[in-house]
Amino acid sequence: RIKHARDADRGADYTSRLMTLGTLVMLAGTVVVMLAAAPLMTALTRGWSPEKLEMATVFALWCLPQVFFYGMYALVGQVLNANGRFGAYMWAPVLNNVVAIGAIVLYLGMFGAYRAGDDLAGWTSAQTVVLAGGHTLGVVLQAVILFLPLRGLGPRGREGSEPFPISP
């Protein structure tokens, strides 16, 4: 990136290529991990009942997309940092935390707190959506909010631009 900062476009084309490659690698990795959710949960939860294993797998499927969005947060954040734009990268996790806290408050308001003796038989898909989906939404927003300050920097896909290979 530093070498390409002297280019006429200040490294925008090189940055676009890196972002394309990074996005594709993170997307592929996330798809692989999601496809492996059931075997991973089976390996990590030895001795769990089939009901608990099923719930763990469903939660994993709701939460594993966070891998992609945390990766995008890091990738876009580093591009912003390299261009001296530190604020959004620093404050984006606050948005994630506010959404996560909101999801917990919503969950407690809709379903109440855990009580001794509660079991999985009473667990609903709505509880999963609010709890796991709410936290995943926070991570998605944490990444997506960084695209606002990124827009003015210039790294974006252009027709005719080859994302591969990345040459020095």
List each model region and its residues.
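Membrane-embedded alpha-helical bundles of multi-pass transporters/translocases
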Residues: 1-168
